[in-house]
């Protein structure tokens, strides 16, 4: 599916020079489609994903990605859930939570 979506994007935007995918898995399909279209990832077109999957570092070129800190996400989710339980299930006011991330630059950019 992801490969087909990238193929369709290349038809609509033949001069495309960069793609950021919602996950690393989507980026893997995009990378395959780009290669099959004769595009050189990291040279003709930059490609990045989100999630920092181990497979991304094994690709050639390595997949640039955004790394989120899952432990921090889990801790914050647990804290909010416990707070809701203490308040008898009330979600209370809408709150904004800012979590850390790291951009991992690899050869696909």
Region annotations inferred by a language model:
Residues 1-2:
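Short, small-residue-biased leader/transition segments that mark boundaries at the very start
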């Amino acid at each position: 599916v992801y490969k087909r979506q990238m193929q369709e994007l290349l038809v609509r935007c033949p001069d495309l020079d960069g793609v950021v995918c919602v996950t690393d898995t989507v980026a893997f399909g995009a990378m395959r489609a780009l290669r099959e279209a004769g595009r050189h990832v990291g040279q003709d077109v930059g490609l990045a994903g989100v999630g920092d999957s181990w497979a991304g570092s094994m690709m050639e070129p390595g997949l640039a990605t955004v790394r989120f800190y899952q432990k921090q996400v889990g801790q914050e989710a647990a804290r909010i859930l416990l707070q809701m339980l203490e308040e008898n299930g009330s979600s209370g006011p809408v709150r904004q939570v800012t979590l850390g991330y790291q951009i991992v630059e690899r050869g696909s950019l």
